Regions:
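Helix-turn-helix repeat elements of alpha-solenoid scaffolds
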Residues: 17-31, 56-71, 92-108, 131-142, ...
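Residue register of alpha-helical TPR repeats
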Residues: 7, 46, 85, 119, ...
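Loop-centered beta-sheet repeat module
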Residues: 134, 138-203
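Amphipathic alpha-helical segments of tetratricopeptide repeats
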Residues: 29-36, 68-76, 104-113, 142-153, ...
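Flexible inter-repeat linkers and adjacent short helices
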Residues: 1-90, 102, 107, 255, ...
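Residue signature of alpha-solenoid helical repeat architecture, marking inter-repeat boundaries
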Residues: 3, 41-44, 79-81, 115, ...
Length: 354
């Protein structure tokens, strides 16, 4: 068994993952898996690294603990490039588990092992974007965009541009976000990339809702493929669009259907109940539910949801003369802006509405 050949397979698989070439990636993994006696060869540690990469990249429901234990036994023979790949995949596993601090720790390790790879920078920008560290996210987006162009990794480039659009959206630069999203939407249609199309249309529904552009919101919502219509955010946006459009009968039907089917998301359940209370002219109950939504979003580090809820609370506090609460919302929105320039974790801020 030529260990060097399997080491090159590790590099090939990581490169195919970077370029989003899933079919070729899985063919390469299958070739390795079908190699006779590889688990007992000098390349056995690379073999288990490839099994680990397969499990995480393809999000398979397997226990990866055994793979990692074996890899740890043999990682001292890995090249620095293999080590950087290993730690980046460990970071990706933690990202899927929403264990952000641990993911950042593994990315730092990957970077230490000569790991200035596109995907490591891409993972940094994704995490910082989720946490609301917008200056840091922007730095890594710019760096990753340059690397993607240099490496001709155009499929990955589109996802980086999507991140740029999301950053515009999070920082209330909606015109810039919409302009970029529409360009990416056209590209996704040309490429017949349904997942990219769904991501972009979802964001366009969100920006339309924020801007109360009801017609555009429904237009984008109706263009999303049926396979994605179970998305709870999209269902929630639909109810909200009916409410903004004064289609109260449809809004009530939408809310009733949502509450019958929502199970595991307290955020969505509280948001829809708040909307129902607004329609039932029970503003104080609506406010209480929105405040619960805010705390849930904050706890989960979901910046976009937290800001969206604050916008609803801002209008309600203003309408019902709750000046102390209104002042607090302004402070929270300012703190979110300041937070984007600071090195702190969103869960540690401890912002309270009461």
């Amino acid at each position: 068994m030529d260990r060097g050949l399997i080491v090159n397979r590790v590099y090939d698989i990581y490169g195919l993952y970077t370029d989003l070439k899933k079919e070729e990636l899985n063919k390469t993994i299958k070739i390795v898996k079908d190699t006779k006696n590889i688990a007992c060869s000098y390349a056995r540690f690379e073999y288990y690294l490839i099994l680990y990469m397969d499990a995480i990249i393809n999000q398979k429901e397997v226990d990866t603990a055994l793979y990692k234990r074996i890899i740890e036994l043999g990682k001292n023979i890995f090249s620095v490039r293999e080590l950087s790949i290993y730690y980046d995949i460990m970071a990706l596993e933690k990202m899927y588990l929403n264990e952000t601090k641990e993911a950042l720790g593994y990315l730092d390790k990957a970077l230490c092992y000569n790991g200035n790879h596109l995907m490591i920078n891409y993972h940094y920008c994704s995490i910082y974007l989720d946490l609301g560290y917008f200056n840091l996210a922007q730095q890594y987006i710019h760096k990753s965009l340059r690397m993607a162009v240099q490496q001709l990794s155009f499929d990955r480039l589109y996802y980086l541009l999507l991140n740029q659009g999301v950053l515009y959206m999070y920082t209330s630069r909606y015109d810039e976000a919409n302009k970029l999203f529409l360009k990416l939407l056209n590209e996704s249609i040309k490429r017949q990339n349904e997942i990219m199309k769904y991501c972009i249309l979802s964001n366009l529904v969100f920006t339309s809702l924020i801007q109360k552009d009801i017609k555009s919101g429904f237009d984008y919502l109706n263009r999303i493929d049926e396979q994605f219509t179970d998305d709870l955010d999209l269902k929630m946006y639909k109810c909200h669009l009916y409410y903004f459009d004064n289609e109260y009968t449809k809004a009530k039907e939408c809310i009733a259907s949502f509450l019958r089917n929502v199970k595991d998301s307290k955020y969505h359940e509280n948001f829809i109940r708040a909307l129902k209370y607004m329609m039932d002219n029970k503003p104080m109950k609506a406010i209480a539910n929105f405040e619960t939504c805010y705390q849930i979003a904050l706890k989960n580090g979901q910046y976009d949801r937290a800001i969206f809820v604050l916008k609803q609370l801002n209008e309600l506090y203003l309408d019902f003369g709750l000046q102390n609460k209104l002042k607090k919302v302004k402070e929270l929105q300012e703190n979110f802006y300041k937070m984007s320039h600071a090195n702190q974790i969103i869960e540690d801020i401890g912002l309270k509405l009461n």
